[in-house]
From Swiss-Prot:
Compartment annotation: Cytoplasm
EC code: 1.18.1.-
Protein name, as recorded: Nitric oxide reductase FlRd-NAD(+) reductase
Pfam families in UniProt: Pyr_redox_2, Rbx_binding
Taxonomic source organism: Escherichia coli O6:K15:H31 (strain 536 / UPEC)
Gene: norW
Reactions accelerated catalytically: 2 reduced [nitric oxide reductase rubredoxin domain] + NAD(+) + H(+) = 2 oxidized [nitric oxide reductase rubredoxin domain] + NADH
């Protein structure tokens, strides 16, 4: 009798994989194990919950029970996997164990929290569960400090500002979105955030936090202090690799997989935010969707390599939305930037005048798909 496929995790990657497997095979045994409730929600919505007045439970799209019934699964929610015996093909928790033929790690990534004194006062918004734990504090907060001016930090800063809160955004870089694009490209969004009232503290660093009678005192570099009611870390994600490491799998930044999503063990695969695909960590929806389609085929014996096309990344800042694609972080590109009231088109070209990256905003976002077709890969 087949032990089937066991998937550890229940987020977007795991669900996309289940749906793709069931399109091809209605009966192969599928087991999902995860530490959370396994209810489905759209993770990108977490960047907009405050301005839209949503509670954590409002985000639920489908309960775990409904998902299990629809796709013929065995689910084990609120279950921590403690070990994987790769040789015996067994997954273990404190009170249970499961045999598998093929195992998929879809354990996601956790929010990085700066290691400063008072770090226990820092909130993260990387899951519905995390939002549920702090939604009352965030709803009641008048003054909010967001640590990290990347994609998520910029989205959160705009959302909290739109909700009428006093927002301070701090980052040690000289501009927002510094790991994604040069300052001459991000300056349009940076200016819009400032116009809205976001207080930007760039080239600045959080050094510590302390609870006070009236809030939280944040100590910054250069002997500066501000008092706020809530502090949120948006300083990046770290792939969850501890379980894979204990199983003896090859780990770098994430769980290392090849073009077939296969780890260093032939019967164990990794998918989503925890995976490092041929040296790349790609924590975006489109590569996860494409990876899930390919992995479903591979698990069912139809070996197919993953080939990722040029893909759009969307920055969901409603007052000034952006789409970007290509190698926007490359230092050697020359940028041609065209701005007008309706939006911006920024093209990054190499020494051969080949288009290597672009960023478009607002009404000019309709040009994104045309530019995508001309992007040199």
């Amino acid at each position: 009798m087949s032990n089937g496929i066991v998937i550890i995790g229940s987020g977007f990657a795991a669900r996309q994989l289940v749906k793709n497997i069931r399109k091809q095979d209605a009966s192969i045994p599928l087991t999902l194990i995860a530490a959370d409730s396994m209810d489905e929600y759209n993770k990108p919505d977490l960047s907009h919950v405050i301005s839209q007045g949503q509670r954590a439970d409002d985000l639920t799209r489908q309960t775990a029970g409904e998902f299990a019934e629809q796709f013929n699964l065995r689910l084990f929610p609120h279950t921590w996997v403690t070990d994987i015996d790769a040789e015996a093909h067994v997954v273990k928790s404190q009170n249970n164990q499961w045999q598998y033929d093929k195992l998929v790690l879809a354990t996601g990534a956790s929010a990085f929290v700066p290691p400063v004194p008072g770090r226990e006062l820092i909130l993260t918004l990387n899951s519905q569960q995390e939002y549920r734990a702090c939604e009352t504090q965030l709803r009641d907060a008048r003054r909010v400090l967001i640590v990290g001016g990347g994609l998520i930090g910029s989205e959160l800063a705009m959302d909290f500002c739109r909700a009428g809160k006093a927002v301070t955004l701090i980052d040690n870089a000289a501009s927002i979105l510094a790991s994604l694009m040069p300052p001459e490209v991000s300056s349009r969004l940076q200016h819009r955030l400032t116009e809205m009232g976001v207080h930007l503290l760039l080239k600045s660093q959080l050094q510590g936090l302390e609870k006070t009678d009236s809030g939280i005192l944040a100590t910054l570099d250069r002997q500066r202090c501000i008092e706020v009611d809530a502090v949120i870390a948006a300083t990046g994600l770290r792939p969850e690799t501890a379980l894979a490491r204990r199983a003896g799998l090859t780990i770098n930044r994430g769980v290392c997989v090849d073009s077939y999503l296969q780890t260093s063990n032939a019967d164990i695969y990794a998918l989503g935010d925890c995976a490092e695909i041929n040296g790349q960590v790609l924590p975006f929806l489109q590569p996860i969707q494409l990876s899930a389609m390919v992995l479903a085929k591979n698990l069912l014996g139809n070996n197919t390599p993953l080939k990722l096309p040029a893909m759009l990344v969307k920055i969901k800042t409603p007052e000034l939305p952006l789409h970007l694609a290509g190698e926007t972080q490359r230092q050697d590109l020359r940028w041609h930037i065209y701005t007008e009231r309706q939006g911006m088109v920024a093209r990054g070209v190499d020494d051969a005048d080949q288009l290597r990256a672009f960023v478009v905003s607002e009404d000019r976002m309709k040009e994104a798909f045309g530019l995508l077709k001309t992007l040199s890969m």
